[in-house]
Amino acid sequence: RVVLTPFWIVAGPDFEAMRDAGCLDGAGHCEYKELWWHNSSGGLDRPPFERGDLRALYQEGFARGLWHPEYHGRSHFDTAAWAAYLAEGDHITALYFEAGLTYYHYGRLNASSRSFHSIHSEYLSDDGQFQKGPAQLTAWTHEGLRAFEAFWGYASRVTAMPCHYGGPEMGGVFAAAGVAGVEGEEKGRGLLPGLRNSPRLMFDPAFESPRAWEDVLAHTQREAER
């Protein structure tokens, strides 16, 4: 029986709390604040989305055998860089914030770091001044994994890093928390030492040439015969 494996983000930004704390006031200070799935109904229950509390539906999918979630991350994006860009009054970051959104990357050059504004991974900062040290990475990740278990009722044993983007030290961080395997790209991005590595097969020929269907089917056949 085929069961889906959604890689699950356990928390996200609390836009209301951050706004109330002055992140858009131009005061030069902004602290990242979180909404967790295990103790709140999440951001989708709030404006502008207002989709209601979806937690029971998510867990029903697991209870009925539709999917078996595993850990993806705590935020998906670089929260330290995001909060700093808000604090400095960056127009694009504030524009997305007002819409209840973050972003992946845009081309404004940061004068101090000589990096372009990019917040696309929680583990490896594109803007190096915001990179978490080893102790921070461990605490950040282990707290996220505990939140995953609090919501789903079991510990995650497999992960896929956001955007398959993180340093090799993440292998030890995950292994110390009991994670045994990682999914990454076939070319090697996102695979980690010390874990069982599972290269991901892209199953969307729309992104490739028409030959991709043949490649997908051939790969599937080889895997089935192993």
What are these regions (language model features)?
Residues 203-212:
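A recognition module on extended beta-rich or small alphabeta surfaces enriched in W/G with H and D/E
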